[in-house]
Amino acid sequence: MKKLLLISLIGTLGLLVAADRGSRTIPQPNKPIPKEEIIKFTGQFKDAKLSRDIRILWLYGPEDHGGGEHDYIRIKELFVPMLETVTRVTVEEAYMFPSQDQFDRADLMIQFLHLPDLTDKQFTMYQNYVDGGGSVVSIHESCIIRPIDRANKLAGCIGCSWQGNKDSHWGKFAKGHPLYLKNDHPAFKGLRQSVTLNDESYWDLRKRNNVEVIGAIAPKSDNEKVSFADILKTEGVRSDAFWTYTSGKGRAFGTTTGHYTYTYFDPMYRLILLRGIAWSLKEDPAPFMPLVFHGITDDEGLVGTTDAMMNYKNRRK
């Protein structure tokens, strides 16, 4: 009996260790890469212009993790002035949830925060914004809302949402589990088949109709010609890393990645996010491409950061 108990205990410990492997990943950015390598994917963007004036609303909230993780205010302070360097773009900020006037003005809302418990009226405002033609880019924890019975309403606005700790999952990932992209989708057309990051994602999310998964974390494949459809069937795949969604006249582009602050200083990650922004707005991505290099290109033409950026004190506003 004792022997059986010991075997059972060892098996349980093995499962716990396996489940915890991702959480033991050491936070570390990718090495900077030459600018000419990135331009292969940005394409030429000199003198590229948007087709119209774009009003962006950046939704943020209090930072809720240790420094370097879920730095909602820090990332807002990085991206808002950067986006405003794009001709014909203006950016407004909203804390926790927009007013109706802000929704009325916005062409695109970018959300990076842990959402509060929204009221039915607020969900109606949000859904009407999307269905009426508004665009949304949802980053990382923005797909989570509590109490969890509100998750279906959130999914109606952005396509996917956290189902609760029993049904949805989270974990860190690194080089052994690349981010695979559906690079025949318009948002990612012409990009690499896979990108390596050292970050965190969620998977097994609640999905609405009209969701298309276009990015997934999976064990590294030796087959360079493996299709994205086959990646989604891989054992151990973490789908829902990136998705697109349409509801009414609106578009949403979502990701469960973007946990660490240094990830936003990675040129390939910026490129992916900016592609999503352009797709959601039905705009050519070229006018946004200078931001891939903005503030992270050194004198030798290397783009990125070597700073893990963990030495930071969280703020509430």
Please state what every model-predicted region is.
Residues 48-53, 84, 101-105, 119-120, ...:
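Extracellular/periplasmic catalytic domains that process cell-envelope and extracellular macromolecules
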Residues 53-64:
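Short beta-strand segments enriched in small/hydrophobic residues
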Residues 33-42, 169-248:
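Catalytic beta-strand/loop cores that center a nucleophilic Ser/Cys/Thr
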Residues 116-191:
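A glycine-rich, often tryptophan-bearing local segment used as a flexible ligand/cofactor-contacting loop or short
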Residues 4-13:
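Sec-dependent N-terminal signal peptides
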Residues 16-19:
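Boundary at the C-terminal end of the N-terminal hydrophobic targeting segment
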Residues 24-27, 68-146:
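Helical hinge/lid and interdomain linker segments adjacent to catalytic or ligand-binding clefts
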Residues 21-51, 223-317:
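Extracellular ligand-binding/catalytic regions of CAZymes and related secreted enzymes
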